[in-house]
């Protein structure tokens, strides 16, 4: 009889696609500062759009406005990828101020719910009549 190991199920943190609409400021350990754009965001990390890539494993401090809050956090940059007009570089959060992570999670959830509601309304308004007499 085969030994069955218990399988672990990992639930990914909800993430929101921002598509570069949220600007962010980052500061490297050496004090250099850059303005970047957020493309994806979750409570564990996200994806930045940069003009030039930054070395993998660089530690940064970042700040950005999201929803009704200003987020200040520490992060570590991951391997950059060539994209569109510059580079896309994933990051993972390594530290938040007190209560920031929970508030960020609430803001992301709120925004996802708003997007789902808007998409549902759009689908209902785009629905064409099933039968000719329904349109009359």
Feature roles, as predicted:
Residues 43, 80-85:
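Short, conserved beta-turn/loop elements at beta-strand boundaries and strand-helix junctions
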Residues 36-37, 73-79:
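Short beta-strand-centered aromatic/proline hotspots
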Residues 65-69:
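Short, charged beta-turn/beta-strand-edge "cap" motif at the junction between a beta-strand
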Residues 22-57, 61, 90:
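Short strand-loop-strand
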Residues 17-23, 53-56, 88-108:
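Short solvent-exposed strand/turn elements
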Residues 1-41, 105, 109-136:
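N-terminal helix initiation/capping motif
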